[in-house]
């Protein structure tokens, strides 16, 4: 019997994690990536407990812990020093925590694991996949490499090439639009003036938002601990951020008037010739799909559900996609034959309501932090502190931030993901469609 052979388009978090799990189950995987080499660009990110559960399932958690920075919670401060957000993972469960990690480290950890299955993995770097055709017994992809056309056949295709993917089936896409706000970001030496186990955010109305995330270290310099700094801006202003001395002084004044201790630290960083930060821009998209897979085709990661980073769930959702596809394949695979309708039914049961919940919450909350609405910040500042006084809401917000929610009143347990047995029938899943809340 022929071993199933999957093509994965894109070697980001979703693509790499899925490749590991498919190879571990004995499948063949070919990865197509349009860049020459993997050199991830981006600020640090926060792996929530849900993502770390998948890391444990993948067998890479211990390695990640040696390079990442343990994060116990999120604190968001207003200019008057009040904590608007004060959410700690222990409110959800005493053993939960997050991990701040550099994107290069995340990529390193996953590719090192993938190398253990090198006999089942084929890489095609600098290969751009432009279209595909699905047939009864195969999927044929078409693309180009160094101005030469190529095509190849596979049993299944997973599209994992990011938020701006042009490959996801247009008929499945309900929303695909750029966010009007993005972020300027930089990676700097570890912030010593704030608690190094907390993601710190700072807000003033809905126009000013800054974040400082413990980011751990990169594999080549494991002793140098880092922090990521984010500053929220409307997208048209990103390219001009801190372009000259006057802009630097104006920005430091803006921060100093609100959070002087942080401003002093930023000033040291900005004017230290050895640590002078390089600022880059991050733009975001909102992508909502009516389904994530059908037949031999699937869409995972940001290609399937890109959203604002407000809830910090992008990488975690990508990892959960990988886990869910692996579980669904095991559920639908008998003697190397795949029951594709059953696979996607199971996958949508695992990922549909959870993705829906986080996208709904992201669309609801993002304008309260990043918008020109005069009322947004005031409403947020009134409601949030009140909610944190109520133990039930504190716990629910901690579970939400953990990435484990599957709906307003349901959530996964960490161990369900981390140590799920092959027989995934213990979930008691019921069919759910991808309708809006």
Language-model region placement:
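Residues at the starts of beta-strands that form the adenosine-phosphate
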Residues: 5, 28, 226
């Amino acid at each position: 019997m022929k071993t199933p052979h999957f093509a994965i388009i894109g070697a980001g978090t979703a693509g790499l994690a899925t490749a590991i799990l498919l190879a571990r189950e004995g499948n063949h995987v070919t990865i197509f990536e349009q860049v020459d080499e993997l050199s991830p660009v981006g600020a640090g990110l926060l792996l929530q407990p849900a993502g770390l559960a998948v890391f444990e399932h993948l067998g890479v958690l211990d390695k990640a812990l040696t390079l990442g920075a343990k994060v116990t919670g999120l604190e968001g401060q207003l200019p008057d020093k009040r904590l608007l957000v004060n959410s700690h993972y222990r409110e959800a469960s005493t053993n939960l925590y997050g991990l701040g990690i550099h994107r290069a480290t995340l990529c390193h950890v996953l590719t090192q694991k993938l190398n253990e299955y090198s006999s089942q993995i084929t890489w095609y770097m600098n290969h751009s996949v432009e279209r595909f055709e699905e047939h009864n017994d195969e999927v044929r992809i078409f693309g180009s490499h160094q101005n030469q056309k190529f095509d190849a056949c596979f049993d299944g295709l997973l599209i994992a090439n990011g938020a701006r993917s042009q490959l996801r089936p247009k008929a499945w896409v309900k929303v695909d639009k750029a966010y009007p706000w993005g972020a300027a970001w930089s990676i700097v030496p570890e912030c010593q003036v704030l608690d190094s186990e907390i993601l710190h955010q700072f807000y003033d109305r809905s126009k000013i938002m800054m974040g400082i995330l413990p980011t751990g270290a990169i594999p080549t310099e494991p002793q140098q601990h880092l922090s990521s700094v984010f500053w929220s801006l409307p997208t048209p202003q990103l390219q001009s951020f801190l372009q000259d001395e006057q802009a630097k002084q104006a920005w430091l004044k803006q921060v100093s008037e609100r959070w002087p201790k942080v401003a002093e630290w930023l000033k040291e960083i900005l004017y230290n010739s050895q640590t002078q930060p390089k600022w880059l821009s991050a733009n975001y998209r909102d992508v909502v799909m009516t389904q994530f897979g059908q037949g031999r085709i699937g869409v995972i990661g940001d290609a399937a559900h890109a959203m604002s980073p407000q809830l910090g769930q992008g990488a975690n959702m990508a990892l959960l996609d990988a886990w869910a596809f692996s579980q669904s394949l095991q559920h639908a695979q008998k003697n190397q034959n795949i029951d594709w309708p059953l696979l996607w039914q199971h996958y949508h049961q695992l990922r549909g309501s959870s993705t829906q919940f986080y996208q709904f919450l992201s669309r609801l909350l993002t304008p309260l932090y990043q918008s020109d609405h005069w009322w947004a910040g005031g409403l947020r500042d009134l409601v949030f502190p009140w909610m944190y006084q109520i133990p039930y809401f504190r716990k629910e917000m901690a579970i939400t931030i953990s990435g484990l929610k599957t709906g307003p009143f349901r959530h996964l347990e960490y161990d369900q993901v981390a140590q799920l047995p092959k027989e995934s029938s213990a979930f008691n899943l019921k069919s759910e469609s991808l309708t809006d809340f």
